[in-house]
Amino acid sequence: MEIPMGTQGCFSKSLLLSASILVLWMLQGSQAALYIQKIPEQPQKNQDLLLSVQGVPDTFQDFNWYLGEETYGGTRLFTYIPGIQRPQRDGSAMGQRDIVGFPNGSMLLRRAQPTDSGTYQVAITINSEWTMKAKTEVQVAEKNKELPSTHLPTNAGILAATIIGSLAAGALLISCIAYLLVTRNWRGQSHRLPAPRGQGSLSILCSAVSPVPSVTPSTWMATTEKPELGPAHDAGDNNIYEVMPSPVLLVSPISDTRSINPARPLPTPPHLQAEPENHQYQQDLLNPDPAPYCQLVPTS
């Protein structure tokens, strides 16, 4: 029994379609089984980053790593061909990066930098018709980027303690200075209190005792008339006065440096020594009592 030609054509087309669908499904399954694990997940600056490939078949021809969304020669980092003396061959995108490839398809990026961030893709060639691919996103952060927020309470506490301590020390210093000033002023006033009291008493005494101008010998030498003490001295006064010593000491003015020394009697004028009747009065006038004034007391 022969199969019609039209039926054979339809069967061939159906078989080809089924094979194509099976190949696509196998490719999708291979891509789904291959994935990249980042160690660590969030790398920081100057930290080593391992991109470990999971789901690699036991046998393969080679694998290529790319940095970027496109996979071509300009984005190729390196090609690794196992079984040869020098398996790793760097690509144009390697630059100054320090990358080491491993036979299982993984790669190690040493001392990662923020400029190394981007999309990393790996393509593993099983044969000329089958290539497995996987990709991952890598973001390299600045070193210790989150440390300030972590240590913020500690730094704030230290800052607050420093400020409070400085304020307390300043207040204590100001209090000590104020105490010393007050104590010094109080002691100075206590030492100065006796002086004003003594000066006050002296001023009271001096004000109570009126100063008597000192009599110099020249005044007595110039006097030639006899003193008249009696009723004839004042015609309108009938009282008789006598001289009595004052109980108050004589206080001479400070400006008068020629005051008479009470201990040294004045010389008696020659023309007054010949008159004995007025000798007593002349002696009283020539040698006055050291008193600020003479008290006159009326006698009967």
UniProtKB/Swiss-Prot annotation:
Disulfide bonds: none
One family name in Pfam for this protein: V-set
Induction, as annotated: Down-regulated by dexamethasone (in vitro).
Extracellular side: 33-157
Membrane topology (UniProt): Single-pass type I membrane protein
Disordered as annotated region, ranges: 259-291
Transmembrane segments annotated in the record for this chain: 158-178
Keyword DNA repair applies: no
Glycosylation sites: 104
Topological region Cytoplasmic: 179-300
Signal peptide (UniProt feature, chain positions): 1-32
Family listed: Belongs to the immunoglobulin superfamily. CEA family.
Name of protein: Cell adhesion molecule CEACAM19
Coiled-coil region list: none
Tissues/organs with expression: Ubiquitous with highest expression in prostate, uterus, fetal brain, mammary gland, adrenal gland, skeletal muscle, small intestine, and kidney, and lower expression in lung, cerebellum, testis, liver, pancreas, bone marrow and ovary.
